[in-house]
């Protein structure tokens, strides 16, 4: 899977996923955005929960804490984020199924490693005070904060019934077009550090490979719609000052 990351990154430079502001009926049957997000994200939450509760290691402090961080993220994405959405946008079922597969596979890779595959002494209780865990959890929390704040900014751009696009401002939007995607990438980079695992690394790289091309598409869309008003802001796509 690690080797597929550059393939996905290159492929998505040419294919635009038809959801959100890029929604297209060409992607086939669709469902409401709220239902789509729940269908796409909740299976990962349930998969990790099952892997945890069925494991003999379920009460080991370090794996349990790392699992809970994963579950907190996916509980928010599955049950809080969708219910706070505004408007009546739709999401193609094809996108829902692809996203569901991506999320469940990553949940399995991480959960299987934490509770079944890793050596019994890989994550002692002292791991929770190790430099890697402490650095990782700071990065993880920072990424989550950026993601949640950026989603809130986007959500409040429109009043009920308004379908126009507006330029998001404030927070990390001062530096990038897709601050919400930046937050998600930072979050999973932190998770890769705090677990120090191949599964965590794969998830972080897959997140970037999936979101970076979309951030570029959104940037191009803003430039087309807003012209100099947007270009003068000097924002990058997803990584401040870099990309």
Spans of model-derived segments:
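Membrane-helix and juxtamembrane interface regions of eukaryotic multi-pass membrane proteins
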Residues: 1-101, 243
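Hydrophobic transmembrane alpha-helices
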Residues: 1-11, 48-52, 59, 102, ...
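Eukaryotic endomembrane system proteins
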Residues: 74, 81-131, 135, 141
């Amino acid at each position: 899977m690690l080797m597929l990351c550059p393939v996905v990154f290159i492929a998505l430079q040419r294919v635009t996923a038809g959801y959100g502001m890029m929604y297209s009926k060409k992607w086939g049957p669709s469902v409401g955005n709220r239902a789509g997000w729940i269908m796409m994200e909740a299976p990962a939450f349930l998969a990790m929960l099952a892997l945890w509760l069925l494991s003999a290691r379920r009460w080991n402090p370090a794996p349990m804490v790392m699992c809970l961080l994963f579950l907190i993220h996916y509980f928010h994405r599955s049950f809080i984020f969708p219910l706070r959405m505004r408007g009546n946008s739709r999401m193609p079922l094809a996108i829902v199924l692809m996203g569901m597969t991506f999320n469940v596979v990553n949940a399995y890779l991480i959960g299987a490693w934490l509770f079944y595959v890793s050596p019994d002494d890989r994550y002692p209780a002292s791991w929770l005070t190790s430099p890697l865990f402490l650095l990782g959890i700071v990065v993880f929390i920072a990424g989550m904060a950026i993601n949640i704040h950026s989603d809130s900014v986007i959500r409040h751009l429109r009043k009920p019934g308004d379908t126009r696009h507006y330029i998001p401002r404030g927070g990390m939007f001062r530096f990038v077009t897709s601050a919400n995607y930046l937050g998600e990438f930072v979050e999973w980079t932190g998770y890769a550090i705090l677990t120090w695992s191949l599964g965590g690394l794969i998830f972080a790289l897959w997140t970037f490979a999936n979101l970076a091309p979309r951030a570029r598409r959104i940037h191009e869309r803003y430039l087309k719609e807003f012209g100099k008003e947007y270009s003068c802001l000097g924002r990058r796509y997803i990584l401040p000052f870099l990309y």
